[in-house]
């Protein structure tokens, strides 16, 4: 299968390698070309613009920094759906692994729907585009953290009946769920970090039409051990915000516990053994207590990324009228950490944020 991937960073690079090992042809684009070229030895094919991916690939996966990067990658002049969406006749699925606000995701889905509606009309009316004739699992020619898509996300949609007829028809290819000519956008943020991406055990929280999520599950299964359909477009991003809320609050509490242990004269490194098997035990406890009590370990994740996500949590809480006093405190800890120059450190840096203002020696 022809796959495009935008964003071969710390998470994206191992995901691409899993796709290649699964037998897919993967075309890679990145703003910094060297990061894409580093994957050539693994079998990836590098392209100069996202536009090339839309012309060659049936599915394009995004794993970029933020909503602005998603917008530029998809809707920019050289983006997937840039100057002329009709050029992307092969493209059927945009799967966004980036972590961005749910509202931005829904807006991007609606925008993509408007841009590709003309193409969808042509296909439903009998136009013979490549997107109509070549399914996601078929050989169609060339080589390498929004919403559901042209037909699925246009709101009041004159092509709904045609879509239903298409999906109701018998089709032995499980990937062929998109209506002819449409592009479906699935928001699919992930959890599991670089370790999960490397091991191929990521958890994917997906938002979009159920048929589309089911269609891309075999693809995502190359690097995910679980893909859960959370609901309509934007639901995956909302689930990711819940995930980040729990992770950051838990790690802030663990940092407080480590600090309390140290100031009380206890060897805090023994907390992993002493609390193992009890209610306080968790993957986060076992992973981060050693990182809070040792030095010289390579970071896993970046504080600045969590700051971005918790800022989104705060904005979403405001929009929905949701009281989140714990997350508000965590947000301030993250901001303080960034101001201390710890933006590239992982969340074990919470211990430094808590101890430095009190004059306690840091690690």
Locate the predicted segments by residue:
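Hydrophobic residues within alpha-helices
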Residues: 15-16, 35, 108, 219, ...
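NAD(P)-dependent dehydrogenase/reductase Rossmann-like domain
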Residues: 340-363
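Rossmann-fold dinucleotide-binding core
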Residues: 73, 99-131, 135, 144, ...
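Beta-loop-alpha module in the N-terminal Rossmann-like domain of NAD(P)-dependent dehydrogenases
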Residues: 60-77, 98-105
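NAD(P)+-binding Rossmann beta1-loop-alpha1 motif at the extreme N-terminus of oxidoreductases
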Residues: 1-62, 88, 92-93, 97-98, ...
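Active-site-proximal catalytic alpha-helix in oxidoreductases
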Residues: 199-207, 228, 232-264, 275-287, ...
């Amino acid at each position: 299968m022809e796959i495009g991937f935008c964003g071969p960073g710390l998470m994206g690079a191992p995901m691409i390698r899993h796709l290649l090992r699964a037998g897919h042809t993967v075309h890679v684009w990145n703003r910094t070309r060297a990061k894409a070229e580093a994957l050539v030895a693994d079998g990836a094919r590098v392209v100069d613009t996202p536009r090339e991916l839309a012309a060659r690939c049936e599915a394009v996966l995004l794993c970029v920094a933020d909503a602005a990067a998603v917008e530029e990658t998809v809707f920019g002049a050289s983006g997937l759906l840039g100057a002329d969406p009709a050029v992307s006749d092969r493209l059927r699925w945009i799967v966004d692994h980036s972590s961005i606000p749910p509202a931005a995701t829904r807006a991007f889905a609606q925008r993509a729907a408007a841009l590709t509606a003309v193409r969808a009309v042509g296909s439903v009316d009998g136009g013979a585009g490549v997107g109509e004739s070549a399914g996601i699992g078929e050989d169609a020619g060339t080589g390498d953290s929004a919403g559901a898509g042209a037909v699925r996300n246009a709101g009041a949609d004159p092509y709904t009946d045609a879509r239903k007829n298409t999906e109701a028809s018998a089709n032995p290819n499980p990937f062929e769920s998109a209506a002819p000519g449409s592009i479906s956008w699935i928001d699919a943020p992930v959890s599991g970090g670089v370790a999960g991406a490397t091991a191929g055990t990521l958890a994917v929280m997906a938002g979009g039409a159920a048929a589309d999520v089911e269609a891309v599950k075999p693809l995502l299964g190359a690097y995910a051990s679980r893909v859960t359909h959370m609901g309509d477009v934007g639901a995956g991003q909302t689930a990711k915000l819940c995930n980040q809320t729990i992770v950051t609050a838990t790690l802030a509490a663990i940092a407080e516990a480590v600090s309390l242990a140290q100031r009380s004269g206890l060897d805090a490194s023994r907390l992993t053994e002493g609390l193992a098997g009890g209610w306080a035990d968790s993957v986060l406890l076992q992973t981060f207590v050693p990182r809070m009590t040792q030095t010289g370990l390579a970071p896993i994740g970046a504080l600045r990324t969590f700051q971005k996500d918790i800022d989104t949590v705060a904005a979403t809480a405001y929009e929905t009228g949701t009281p989140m006093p714990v997350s508000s405190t965590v947000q301030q800890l993250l901001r303080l950490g960034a101001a201390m120059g710890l933006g590239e450190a992982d969340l074990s840096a919470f211990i430094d944020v808590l101890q430095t203002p009190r004059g306690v020696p840091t690690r």
